[in-house]
């Protein structure tokens, strides 16, 4: 049995398969995941699991060189915005409009849907390299 890290076998597999510049999107409950996209639906209930905890677990195993968020998060969800800023204090944070974000996210290798129920709690993690 695995001792630590991500225990969800699908997420563990997808994270392990990420290459440099591949994108992974972590999204809220209401996000319109593209029809043909690969995704893992983690929603148990409203708020479970939440957006920030999901990011932290993925970061336990994924090297990230840049993140992309919707600029609307700063105005409409200051609490999660500030947490994202804190978590990624040493990483480039690119802000796009929500519509631009959705267009970029379509290129994600996979999506993780969380139980988050606050507006604009969506992020694209761009995979880095460990060397």
From Swiss-Prot:
Belongs to the RbsD / FucU family. RbsD subfamily. It is found in: Cytoplasm. The lineage of its organism: Bacteria, Thermotogati, Thermotogota, Thermotogae, Petrotogales. Keywords: Carbohydrate metabolism, Cytoplasm, Isomerase. Gene3D superfamilies: RbsD-like domain (3.40.1650.10). Substrate binds at residues 28, 98, 120-122. Pfam families: RbsD_FucU. InterPro entries: D-ribose_pyranase, RbsD-like_sf, RbsD_FucU. Pathway: Carbohydrate metabolism; D-ribose degradation; D-ribose 5-phosphate from beta-D-ribopyranose: step 1/2. It catalyses: beta-D-ribopyranose = beta-D-ribofuranose. One of its GO terms (cellular component) is cytosol. The keyword Glycosyltransferase does not apply. The gene is rbsD. This is D-ribose pyranase. It is an enzyme of class 5 (isomerase). Its main location: cytoplasm. One of its GO terms (molecular function) is intramolecular lyase activity. Homodecamer. The active site is at 20 (proton donor). GO terms for biological process: D-ribose catabolic process. Its EC number is 5.4.99.62.
């Amino acid at each position: 049995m695995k001792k630590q890290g991500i225990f969800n076998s699908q997420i563990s597999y997808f994270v392990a398969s990420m290459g440099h510049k591949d994108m992974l999107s972590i999204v809220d409950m209401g996000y319109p995941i593209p029809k043909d996209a690969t995704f893992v639906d983690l929603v148990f209930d409203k708020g479970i699991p939440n957006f920030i905890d999901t990011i932290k677990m993925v970061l336990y195993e994924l090297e990230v060189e840049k993140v992309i968020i919707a600029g609307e998060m700063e105005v409409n969800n200051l609490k999660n915005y500030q947490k994202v800023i804190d978590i990624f204090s040493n990483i480039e944070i690119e802000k796009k409009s929500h519509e631009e974000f959705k267009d970029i996210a379509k290129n994600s290798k996979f999506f993780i849907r969380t139980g988050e129920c606050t507006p604009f709690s969506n992020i694209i993690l761009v995979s880095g390299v460990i060397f």
